[in-house]
Amino acid sequence: MRARLPDRTGVVDRDGVRVAYEVFEHNGPTLLLIPPSAITHGRVWKGIVGTLARHFRMLITDGLGTGGSDRPLDPRRHAPAEVNADLCALLDAEGVDVAVVVAHCHAVPWALRLAADHPERVLGVVAISPEIEVAREHDHWNPKLAPPGWDLHNKSLWRTEGGYRKWIEFFFDQQLPEPHSTKQYEDGVGWALDTAAEAKIAGDAGLGEPTADEAEQLCATLRCPMLVIHGSVDLCQPVARGIRLAELTDADLVILDGSGHLPHARDPVKVIRLITGFVHRITGEPMTTTTWTRGRSRAKRALYLSSPIGLGHARRDVAVAKELKTLHPELEIDWLAQDPVTRVLEAEGERIHPASRWLASESAHIAAESTGHDLHCFQALRRMDEILVANFMVFQEVVEEGCYDLTVGDEAWDVDYYWHENPELKRGQNVWLTDFVGFLPMPDGGDHEAYLTTDYNAEMIEHIDRFPWIRDRAIFVGSGQDVVPDTFGGQLPAIRDWTNEHFAYSGYITGFTPPDPEEIPAIRERLGYREDEMVCVVAVGGSGVGRALIDKVVAAYPLAKKAMPELRMIVVTGPRIDPATFPERAGLEVRGYVDRLYEHLSVCDLAVVQGGLTTTMELAAAKRPFLYFPLGHHFEQNFHVRHRLERYRAGTCMDYATGDPDDIAARITELAGKPVDYRDVETEGAERAAHLIAELL
Amino acid sequence: MRACQPTVEGVVERDGVAVRFERYGEGEPAILLLPTWTLVHARHWKMQIAYLARHFSALCFDGPGNGGSYTSTEPAAYSDVAYARNAVAVLDAAEVDKAVLVGLSCAASWGLRLRAEHPGRVLGAVFIAPAVPLMPRLPERRVQRFDAVFDDPVDWEKYNAHHWKTDYPDFVRFLMGRIFTEPHSTKQIEDATGWALETDGETLVASDLGLLGFDERTTRKLAARGTCPVLVIHGSDDAVRGHGEGAALAELTGGELVTIAGGGHFPHTRDPVRVNMLIKQFADGVAR
């Protein structure tokens, strides 16, 4: 899912050729973002748009030949004057008098021409990795001098089957010299291949880039303020071009040392801050009525972030926060949180930071990534990249303004990742909490998935080696034995050894105390469960992903009921699945929502659940028999959670793909009401975690 | 040692009196650091000058009665009109066309006058802990009677002409305790006490009388006439001029208000980093 959808989309039509664009409405100054079509389109800005749209009005064009725009094959339609006319038509259509123009690569000359021809309309220009003839190009653009690979830049080749893809794959590899750029690479290749080679060939043929003399003349006519951003290891456009362009235009120059050609994709946080700073400088940063509290007058404050993927984090984090407040009664805790975590926090009377409303939804993304009984959570996390950067920027603004002493992030991937990527932005003490360490590949993902998980693990390990001061404390929710016995992949260390060195262990945090055996009859009576019936609770969590599992279990119900007449099945669908869509059967009750579901789970005779950690560990703590079905392709449920449950000797792991209703019915009748020999689940976890955190205050 | 030395030290003669000024740095825009009440002189900007001079240029001058400018025991020499004329003379002498004004406490009076009467020369105005007659006096100051004769004045009774003339150091000691409500302000108190003792009670009485003409009506009239942007910075714990005065001035001028929670009457000396950054942000905004 995107971090934020445009408020509107539009099309300008000049003589039957249409250019598509998106609009993000805001009261602030207008930014016009021009991608270098036809190699890419407006989505190339995905890492920076969500945040900039909170501060400015945004117009994002796709450019001819790509995205939602037409793909004219006449090179004359791609000529600079035509592009200029398209951009003006767009500004006219949107009633924009003046805009700050942001352009990348060969879109920079377009932006400069717009500023030169219409100085009254362009407040300023941000030129990223400019392709402009003010300094010599890399030798590899010269067919005679090109090193291997660059000879794929060849129209004839592009017109052959698969030829254009070869070039694009090579080219984007060159554009991203930064290690660990797999996602940006996949994105770039995907967008480039959205269009056909012919459109790109036409675009190139019509490009009409200014010659060296023309470029210098163009620069000499510019009057507006400019910012040039250029990576020092840009293999597409030499940094000398950015430097020279800045000299010629008296622009601010920011060289990103170690960056390649796509800094807006690879270092979005830095680029967002540069663009924001530039626009504020030329349009005036709004002063706002505010309060700054003197250091000595400040109460101790913590900002708590709880992952919204599943409700389990919310409950354990509330438990930790309560313990923390008993250790530091003066501590004020704000929560930067989103639905469904906020529901738990509101019920607990916790203070939710108002900026929470700006967060892009992670749980909606996860729901959108799920199909049937399947959620490839590693890829889902990778594809959540633009949501993570948008949410990180909200977080960063909150910590810079809120003067927090402490940040606690329970699997707050955005904070952990982007503070390591932009370590100078860190504020206060920082605690990282997680219940698993290490991305693990699913076997059917083959070598490529193993390569990707290894790359992600390597990046995390490098982050922590290089900047050990970003995580002031890392807490593993569990014990050392709960860490999987695998390695991080490739030549990387064993996960358990590395975790022992870099984490403290809190023990498991349940967030609730399971009932004593003698309390169970009274609770069952209160919940309406008789002694002489076998109560099987089927629960699938809050997202829509559970339908497939429920269907299978409901299909198994008649078979199980036949074998076990005292069976009563309570199916809890969660808010996103309509209970009315299931068949009616005697002894089968389908409910949308059950208050305090954990109470039902803790006194049932058998539970059927997915493989999520929180629910399964609640059942383990309550010593209930249960069947759990890890979601397909969900490495955490299939490896990490399963490993932990096996250590507790808890539950029976089932395979959704191969388990048919007969198997399920047989397992239900076999296990319902049977005693278990689970290992005790610790009950001091929240207290221990709070002590580990409190030492930092 | 000072953090930086002036680029220009000059004296400008205005209607027969000599005003001493300093210019630091060469950048644009100029930040004109206005003199405040005669209690202290231009050195009270010592925590701002080096920083502002690096980003802009800083211009400061002494008012009458304390520091290197002229002195007088005539109240008329201390009117807001006189201060405003001095400021314009300094801008002319330093060849500064337009400046951002920054004024502390009762400098709000001449700041508002400059903003209203010289719109072409003022880009924006920052009022720190402004003393403007827009609110009732702070409750603890209601005991003060300027012209009364107290045998043994306590607290704000010490804000009194007779006391200043007879035991000026005692008044200074008292007032410093009210200016610096923040704990651990010993250095700031020593500095300001030293500057205060460079003048005397007699002069301070004249200067106080000179301010009397700046009443609520004048304040409202001048605030309404000015158009350039305003930033008000006011400590929540200001025990000399209540935070409500700053809030009222911000509202009256359509300006922004930044509250320093826990701050007293001299936030620019006690929280110089925050105040410097606020001035810079404001100046960047109005000078673009």
Question: What are the roles of these predicted feature ranges?
Answer:
Chain A
Residues 13, 17-71:
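Conserved HGGG/HGGXW glycine-rich cap/lid loop of the alpha/beta-hydrolase fold
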Residues 60-106, 273:
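Active-site loop/oxyanion-hole signature of alpha/beta-hydrolase fold enzymes
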Residues 112-116, 122-157, 628:
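Flexible "cap/lid" loop of the alpha/beta hydrolase fold
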Residues 136, 157-213, 218:
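Conserved alpha/beta-hydrolase catalytic His-Asp/Glu region
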Residues 222, 228-230:
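Short beta-strand/loop motif that positions the catalytic acidic residue
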Residues 331-382:
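Conserved nucleotide-sugar phosphate-binding/catalytic loop shared by glycosyltransferases and other
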Residues 440-444, 448-544, 574-576:
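A nucleotide-sugar donor-handling region in carbohydrate enzymes
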Residues 507-606, 657:
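Donor-nucleotide binding loops and adjacent catalytic segments primarily
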